[in-house]
Amino acid sequence: MYTYVGKKRLSGPKAEVEDILEELVDVMEEKYGMKASIMPVGSVRSNLVTADEDGHFDLDYNICFSKVPQDVRNNLQGLRGRVRKAFDDIAGDLFFYGRERKSVIRFEHSEESYNLDLGILIRNNNGQYCRLVVDRKSREYQLNEIALLYDASKKEDYIFSHNGKDQLASLYLKNKNKHPETDSFHIYLEAVNTCLLYTSPSPR
């Protein structure tokens, strides 16, 4: 059974992760000439992080690169490796490298009961951000457009501005417990879309 992580318990891990990620941004620019920013994602952005029965939870963030040299764009696997190594060098023994997932690098905390799932985004020539992913069949590294991510952020803002956060929190937790095998971000997106139907004005 999933439950929400309270703000007090969440504040320490979030601060710890964000300090490391901000240093990661500095290192990537100083060492590789790559400009980036950090973006909390989904339930982290809306402070609706859930923990399982053992108290374990995930924190989802993206590192968003707005400037990437062409030689780096031509070696996406190498970019992912650079991000992972730089994070490892900064975090030291606090985190260890877990398994690599399709769209994120998972870092597991060595002492606390939580993970960091870090996505890598790169801005393309059209000014849109694309996510660096690994194709599960071919094992090739690719860039996929992420319109859903920014669409969800706009919907969240609308829901929160129309006093719909409690409804979103209730629905997300209900669906999370109903479908524990499903990826949390997609459950969250579904909850956002459902809540939007109730908060949007009805057509006349």
How should each PLM-predicted stretch be described?
Residues M1-P40:
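Helical scaffold of the NTase/Pol beta-like nucleotidyltransferase catalytic core
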Residues M28-L59, I63-R73:
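Active-site nucleotide-donor binding segment shared across nucleotidyl transfer reactions
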Residues Y32, R80-N126:
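Conserved catalytic core of two-metal-ion nucleotidyltransferases
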Residues F57-Y97:
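Aromatic- and glycine-enriched beta-alpha-beta binding-site module
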Residues N115-N163:
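Extended, alpha-helix-rich binding/interface surfaces that flank or overlap catalytic cores
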Residues N163-H179:
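Transcription/chromatin regulatory elements, primarily intrinsically disordered
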Residues L189-V192:
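Long, charge-rich alpha-helical interaction segments
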Residues Y198-R204:
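Conserved small/polar residues in nucleotide/adenosyl-binding loops
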